Structure formats: structure tokens, C-alpha cells
């Protein structure tokens, strides 16, 4: 049996852990601008290659603290193709609010600038509700653009805790292959077929850029002319291409994280999840290893990060201004 590593154990009791309450601001809202040297608000960023368990860890952290999750996967921002893009399911999310997940039409383009603006609005919205923002996703270039903006606004306003869920590449390669097979069993071929447009072979925009969509082009255009044996052979080649492209993506994502840590000197806490994946044939053993090696240590890291300095953010409802700004940004992304 193939265990889905990103599945959160919603129904199992969690070990005792701190619950974060943001205290009221010491100086009042009008004094914040007059106290630029005061404590910053806190943001957790979870990074990692595709398939390493980022979503699972984000939910684990969010259910142990008062937190909400902000997606940083530029493909998952779009609506549709939930299997192909491996979006977190309602069951897996355990009731934790997720932002910027499936909010744009499939054909909409999302630039790094668009994403940064939307992410900043989401962070403000989460903080205004007295919650901890957790940014999670595989689009490291967008995360870099958000955190290291040219004006240094992000780092001047927020303290960041960077967690990197890492898996040894040979082990991850095997898991990625199994995950693609599992996606096929879950209906990936049928899902892509519903989106496929014989009159349009442009895969450079929107959700059609997702790995697992353009690879099917030759299959759908030729399957009606093939016998059963040739059809299965072609499908097998398509799936192998998807597996290869997914693993190559994982390698690039890992290289980008290494660059951020070594070249740009980001303080990134690496969490090795390799032993979890080597135990994936036994769900119980894998879950125990996950808690001991990944979720538990990450919870401790976040606890120390949050208890370092109290947040300056008062407990207030999200402002209508933030909500309106988000609506405007979503509308801008719809412009072709």
C-alpha cells in the first residue's frame, strides 16, 4: 500500500504543545509607526521540494498554534486540476483556513509581483485576526521575491522562521514515481481530459503550465487512432515523462533552497524527513517517525521562535480595506 505522505493525522490526538495567543500592542495602533524599533510580527515559512510533506507539516504546525496557511505554489493558486496539482484536500486541511489556494481562474497568469501583493494582503489579514501566518509551497522564486523585496519592506516588518523539509533525492525519486501512479488511480487522466482543448496547444499560461498537463497532449491527440496495446504503451511513456519532469522539478527546488541558504544566507532550519519515507510501507511506523523526526522538532523550533519576542499585533478583526484590496488584486490577475 502506498502511503500519502502529505496526509495529516486529523483524527489522532496531538501531543501537548503550546497554543499561541498574540498579546495586545503595548503602544496602541497609532504608536506603531512611531516605534520602528519595536518587536516585529512573526511569519513561518515552510519550504521543500515537491512531495516532501510541506503541506502535512504546515497543517501540523497550524493545528498546534493559532495559525492559518498561505499557499506559495504558483500553480495551486489556480482553480481546477486538483489531482494533477496535488492540492491539499478538505480532509487533509483539518479545518485550517488556507489562503491563495484555488482563487484564480485556470487561464489567468500570475506574476511574482501579483503574488507578492496578494501574499502581503493575506499575511495582514491573518495577523489582524490574531493568528500566525504560515507560508507554504514549492515556488521558491516567488517566496524569495516576497521576502527579499527591493525596498526590504518585508524583513523590516516581519521576523521569519524558515523550515525546510528535505528528503534524500534517491528516496524522493521512488516516492515521486509512486505518487504519480497513485494520481492515475485517483483519476488524473480523466481530470486532464476534461480540461484538454484540441484547438489550443499553448501550455505557457495559467494552470496548463502544471507538470502533468502538457505531457498528455500527444496522448489525447492520438489515442483514437491506436489499438489498445499501443494506447497503453503511449500512456506509459507519458507517465514516465511526468515522473521524470516531476523529479527534475524537485531537484531544481532543492537547489534553489540551497542557494538561498548558502549564497543569500537565509537562516533555514533543515528537517530531514528521509527516514519517514523509507518507512512508508508501514503507515504506523511512518507516522511515528514523522512525529519524532519532523513534526515534533519543527514544533519546538516554532515555539522558540514565537516565544522570543511577543508580537506587536493587537487582536482585531481583518479590516474591510484589506479584503477590498485583495479583491482588486484578484481582478487585476484576470486581465489577459
Swiss-Prot record:
It comes from the Eukaryota. Pfam families: IPPT. Residues 334-336 form a propeptide. Its main location: plastid. InterPro entries: Dimethylallyltransferase, P-loop_NTPase. GO terms for molecular function: AMP dimethylallyltransferase activity; ATP binding; ATP/ADP dimethylallyltransferase activity. The modification Cysteine methyl ester is found at residue 333. Keywords: ATP-binding, Chloroplast, Cytokinin biosynthesis, Cytoplasm, Lipoprotein, Membrane, Methylation, Nucleotide-binding, Nucleus, Plastid, Prenylation, Transferase, Transit peptide. It is an enzyme of class 2 (transferase). Disruption phenotype: No visible phenotype except some decreased root thickening, due the redundancy with other IPTs. Its EC number is 2.5.1.112. It catalyses: dimethylallyl diphosphate + ADP = N(6)-(dimethylallyl)adenosine 5'-diphosphate + diphosphate; dimethylallyl diphosphate + ATP = N(6)-(dimethylallyl)adenosine 5'-triphosphate + diphosphate. GO terms for biological process: cytokinin biosynthetic process. Residues 1-55 form a transit peptide. It is found in: Plastid, Chloroplast; Nucleus membrane; Cytoplasm. It is a lipid-anchor. ATP binds at residues 48-55. Induction: Down-regulated by cytokinins and up-regulated by nitrate, but not by ammonium. Farnesylated. Belongs to the IPP transferase family. Involved in cytokinin biosynthesis. Catalyzes the transfer of an isopentenyl group from dimethylallyl diphosphate (DMAPP) to ATP and ADP. This is Adenylate isopentenyltransferase 3, chloroplastic. It comes from Arabidopsis thaliana. The gene is IPT3.
Amino acid at each position: 500500500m502506498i502511503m500519502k505522505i502529505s496526509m495529516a493525522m486529523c483524527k489522532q490526538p496531538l501531543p501537548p504543545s503550546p497554543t499561541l495567543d498574540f498579546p495586545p500592542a503595548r503602544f496602541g495602533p497609532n504608536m506603531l509607526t512611531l516605534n520602528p524599533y519595536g518587536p516585529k510580527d512573526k511569519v513561518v515559512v515552510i519550504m521543500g521540494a515537491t512531495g516532501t510533506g510541506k503541506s502535512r507539516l504546515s497543517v501540523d504546525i497550524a493545528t498546534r498554534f493559532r495559525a492559518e496557511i498561505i499557499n506559495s505554489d504558483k500553480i495551486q493558486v489556480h482553480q481546477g486540476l486538483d489531482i494533477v496539482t496535488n492540492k491539499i484536500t478538505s480532509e487533509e486541511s483539518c479545518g485550517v483556513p488556507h489562503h491563495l489556494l484555488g482563487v484564480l481562474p485556470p487561464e489567468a497568469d500570475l506574476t511574482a509581483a501579483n503574488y507578492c501583493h496578494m501574499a502581503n494582503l493575506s499575511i495582514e489579514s491573518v495577523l489582524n485576526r490574531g493568528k500566525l501566518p504560515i507560508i507554504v509551497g514549492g515556488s521558491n522564486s516567488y517566496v524569495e521575491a516576497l521576502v527579499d523585496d527591493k525596498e526590504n519592506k518585508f524583513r523590516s516588518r516581519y521576523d521569519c522562521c524558515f523550515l525546510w523539509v528535505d528528503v534524500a533525492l534517491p528516496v524522493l525519486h521512488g516516492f515521486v514515481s509512486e505518487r504519480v501512479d497513485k494520481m492515475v488511480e485517483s483519476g488524473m487522466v480523466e481530470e486532464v481530459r476534461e480540461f484538454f482543448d484540441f484547438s489550443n496547444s499553448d501550455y505557457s499560461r495559467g494552470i496548463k503550465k502544471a507538470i502533468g498537463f502538457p505531457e498528455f497532449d500527444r496522448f489525447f491527440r492520438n489515442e483514437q487512432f491506436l489499438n489498445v496495446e499501443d494506447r497503453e504503451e503511449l500512456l506509459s511513456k507519458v507517465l514516465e515523462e511526468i515522473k521524470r519532469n516531476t523529479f527534475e522539478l524537485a531537484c531544481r527546488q532543492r537547489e534553489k533552497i540551497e542557494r538561498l541558504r548558502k549564497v543569500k544566507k537565509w537562516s533555514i532550519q533543515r528537517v530531514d524527513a528521509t527516514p519517514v519515507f523509507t518507512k512508508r510501507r508501514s503507515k504506523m511506523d511512518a507516522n511515528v517517525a514523522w512525529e519524532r523526526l519532523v513534526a515534533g522538532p519543527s514544533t519546538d523550533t516554532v515555539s522558540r521562535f514565537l516565544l522570543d519576542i511577543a508580537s506587536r499585533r493587537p487582536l482585531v478583526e481583518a479590516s474591510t480595506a484589506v479584503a477590498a484590496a485583495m479583491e482588486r488584486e484578484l481582478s487585476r490577475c484576470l486581465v489577459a
